[in-house]
């Protein structure tokens, strides 16, 4: 069944008639029209609960703007809008590539110098050249009002590191403006494990100055270029590249050169272990035994640490960080290293790397192997976006077998943890490649492969091909293969497990309903209430403030990721409203009125209504606030 986009308003069905093909079967007493849906939401607005704010719609291309809005902008009638829609031969879908990019720092122009937040305060290293405010009185005069009486950081950790810049500062500032500390809570938190895998400042400087030695990576790359690599399939010939062709010139150099890999020019001290001089054999590596476990997919943008904490709470067994670009990690970019952070609740955790060159991928793998704590490293061979594909990464590696083999062998040669691969069925819709690559991946040393049952061309315009995944699971044996695609209920999970896969990966299903993991483990449908869903969002904002901070930048960054998640959550249809549970992932919800106002508000697919929900949790948005979701649904017809 084809899956296409439907993003307007609160759904795509404009009538109350019988269920159509591709439309979620909602009970007749709840179905409504587009006009009644928005009249209900606008009529029941609580006075003063939310102010009207621009949502960024005018900055979007006109073809999309017609679909996003109610059809009443600037006083134009519905007939006029429909005539304009007929002039568009094909409606826009996919990503909002031309959306405005507003950083959280934009809303915090008068920032206080960080030196004032140190305890005790330290002199500013920049002096008169500092671009931040040094006048505390002036800062407090211009600072917006607090967003609430409680500070999550102060209550959780006993001390808020943002002091007077916190948007909830009233909860922990003394009568003289001093930052209060709860010594007992601080002492208790000191005994608990903290978030791991941060980037050390000293290491960041070494990376930026290219002073990091990649001895094991150089040795692994030399082995790849000097010895012929065996081919697993006789019909396939792997073309060997010369060392010059095999290198990416814009990457880091090693200290001392590659001519003397046996000895490092950097003096070392301390105990010498076997792992320092003897490379682990594949049979000696740590095993990755996750068969039968629920695997949360590495989700770009939405798969952040606060969201993973939510999914862990509902029963996810395995988590993986968002896709990290290896060249950005080698350059010491803080934003990229933030994707590798691991919360203590993530007991089985991995990171996903994306790259197109064996040298940069191997060096990055060695760097992560000795600096962060993970249970496995995953190579992204499934990313379909043009920015990655045209550079030879993501799905493009499936057509670059020589480079793909060098990357897998090189990365696997420097890791002490298992190596996994996430891939698609292929690049083109009618040309499947996975069944040919899986035996090779098994012999290259890959511990586990996750297969998304769609090609790059298909994106989400087709249902996942689970019969093909079943075929690939047999070909890959004894290497475990996880299946991914269209899991939105425990029935879907049960059917997927019957194909012979070792386990299932959940992606969009977790975005629509993170309690899906509980449903699968308890084998039931959870008719969750709107108040329970709001509590989940409240917990997400608390986790977000812990992770990104409680100052203006942290609050707005938390709001942004909350809104991105709401662009998926709005597609969930409550179980009690369905005629025939469960909801299918390729069925779009029609316009419906929920069992209470909040349930109806959560069903709206307008950015303005998502902002209203965010204001319930994070207070009013700053002046000039703009938001457009990164992803638009193209999975409905």
From Swiss-Prot:
Classification via Pfam families: Dus, zf-CCCH_4
Residue list for modification Phosphothreonine: 260
Stored CDD domains: DUS_like_FMN
Annotated keywords: Flavoprotein, FMN, Isopeptide bond, Metal-binding, mRNA processing, NAD, NADP, Oxidoreductase, Phosphoprotein, Repeat, tRNA processing, Ubl conjugation, Zinc, Zinc-finger
Disordered: annotated segments: 1-21, 41-63, 85-105
The enzyme's E.C. designation: 1.3.1.89, 1.3.1.-
Sequence ranges of Basic residues compositional bias: 89-104
Catalytic activity: 5,6-dihydrouridine(47) in tRNA + NAD(+) = uridine(47) in tRNA + NADH + H(+); 5,6-dihydrouridine(47) in tRNA + NADP(+) = uridine(47) in tRNA + NADPH + H(+); a 5,6-dihydrouridine in mRNA + NAD(+) = a uridine in mRNA + NADH + H(+); a 5,6-dihydrouridine in mRNA + NADP(+) = a uridine in mRNA + NADPH + H(+)
Phosphoserine sites (modified residues): 263-264
Binding site for FMN: 298-300, 352, 422, 452, 484-486, 507-508
Cofactor(s) it depends on: FMN
GO biological process, one term: mRNA processing
EC top class named in words: oxidoreductase
Superkingdom: Eukaryota
InterPro entries the record matches: Aldolase_TIM (IPR013785), DUS-like_FMN-bd (IPR035587), tRNA_hU_synthase_CS (IPR018517), Znf-CCCH_4 (IPR041367), Znf_CCCH (IPR000571)
Function, in words: Catalyzes the synthesis of dihydrouridine, a modified base, in various RNAs, such as tRNAs, mRNAs and some long non-coding RNAs (lncRNAs). Mainly modifies the uridine in position 47 (U47) in the D-loop of most cytoplasmic tRNAs. Also able to mediate the formation of dihydrouridine in some mRNAs, thereby regulating their translation.
Name recorded for this polypeptide: tRNA-dihydrouridine(47) synthase [NAD(P)(+)]-like
Taxonomic source organism: Mus musculus
Gene name per UniProt: Dus3l
């Amino acid at each position: 069944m084809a899956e296409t986009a439907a993003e307007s308003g609160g759904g795509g069905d404009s009538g109350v008639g019988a269920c159509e093909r591709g439309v979620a079967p909602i009970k007749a007493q709840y179905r409504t029209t587009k006009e009644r849906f928005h009249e209900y939401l606008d009529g029941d607005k609580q006075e003063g609960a939310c102010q009207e704010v621009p949502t960024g719609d005018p900055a979007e291309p006109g073809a999309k703007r017609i679909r996003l809005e109610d059809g009443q902008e600037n006083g134009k009638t519905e007939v006029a809008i429909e005539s304009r829609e007929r002039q568009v031969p094909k409606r826009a879908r996919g990503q909002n590539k031309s959306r405005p990019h507003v950083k959280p720092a934009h809303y915090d122009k008068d920032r206080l110098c960080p030196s004032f937040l140190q305890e005790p305060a330290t002199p500013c290293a920049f002096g008169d050249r500092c671009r931040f405010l040094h006048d505390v009185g002036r800062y407090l005069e211009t600072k917006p009002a607090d967003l609430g009486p409680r500070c999550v950081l102060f209550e959780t950790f006993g001390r808020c590191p943002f002091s007077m810049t916190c948007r909830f500062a009233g909860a922990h500032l003394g009568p003289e403006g001093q930052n209060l500390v709860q010594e007992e809570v601080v002492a208790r938190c000191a005994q608990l494990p903290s978030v791991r895998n941060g980037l050390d400042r000293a290491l960041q400087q070494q990376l930026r100055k290219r002073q990091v030695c990649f001895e094991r990576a150089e040795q692994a790359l030399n082995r790849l270029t000097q010895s012929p690599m065996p081919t697993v399939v006789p019909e396939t010939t792997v073309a060997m590249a010369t060392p010059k062709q095999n290198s990416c010139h814009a990457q880091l150099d090693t200290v001392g050169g590659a001519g003397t890999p046996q000895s490092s020019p950097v003096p070392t001290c301390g105990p010498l272990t076997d792992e320092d001089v003897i490379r682990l054999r594949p049979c000696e590596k740590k095993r990755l035994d996750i068969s039968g476990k629920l695997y949360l997919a590495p989700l770009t943008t939405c798969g952040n640490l606060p969201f993973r904490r939510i999914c862990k709470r509902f029963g996810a067994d395995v988590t993986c960080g968002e896709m990290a670009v290896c060249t950005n990690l080698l350059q010491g970019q803080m934003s990229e290293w933030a994707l590798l952070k691991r919360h203590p609740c993530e007991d089985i955790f991995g990171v996903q790397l994306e790259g197109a060159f064996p040298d940069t991928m191997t060096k990055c793998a060695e760097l992560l192997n000795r600096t962060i704590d993970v249970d496995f490293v995953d190579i992204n061979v499934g990313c379909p976006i043009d920015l990655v594909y045209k550079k030879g990464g993501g799905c493009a590696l499936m057509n670059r077998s020589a480079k793909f083999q060098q990357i897998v062998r090189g990365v696997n040669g420097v890791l002490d943890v298992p190596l996994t691969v996430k891939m698609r069925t292929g690049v083109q819709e009618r040309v499947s490649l996975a069944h040919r690559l899986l035996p090779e991946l098994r012999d290259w040393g890959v511990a586990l492969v996750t297969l998304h049952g769609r090609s790059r061309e298909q994106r989400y315009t087709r249902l996942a091909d689970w019969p093909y995944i079943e075929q690939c699971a047999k070909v890959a044996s004894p290497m475990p293969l996880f299946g991914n695609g269209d899991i939105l209920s425990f029935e879907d999970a049960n059917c997927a497990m019957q194909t012979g896969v070792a386990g299932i990966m959940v992606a969009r299903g977790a975005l629509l309903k993170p309690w899906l993991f509980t449903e699968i483990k308890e084998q039931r449908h959870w008719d969750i209430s709107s108040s329970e869903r709001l509590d989940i969002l409240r917990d997400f904002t608390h986790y977000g403030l812990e992770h990104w901070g409680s100052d203006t930048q942290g609050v707005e960054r938390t709001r942004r990721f909350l809104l991105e998640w709401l662009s998926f959550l709005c597609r969930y249809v409550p179980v009690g409203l369905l005629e025939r549970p469960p909801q299918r992932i390729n069925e779009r919800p029609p316009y419906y009125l929920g069992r209470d106002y909040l349930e109806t508000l959560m069903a709206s697919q307008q950015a303005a209504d998502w902002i209203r929900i965010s204001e319930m949790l994070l207070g009013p948005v700053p002046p000039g606030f703009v938001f457009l979701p990164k992803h638009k649904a193209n999975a409905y017809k």
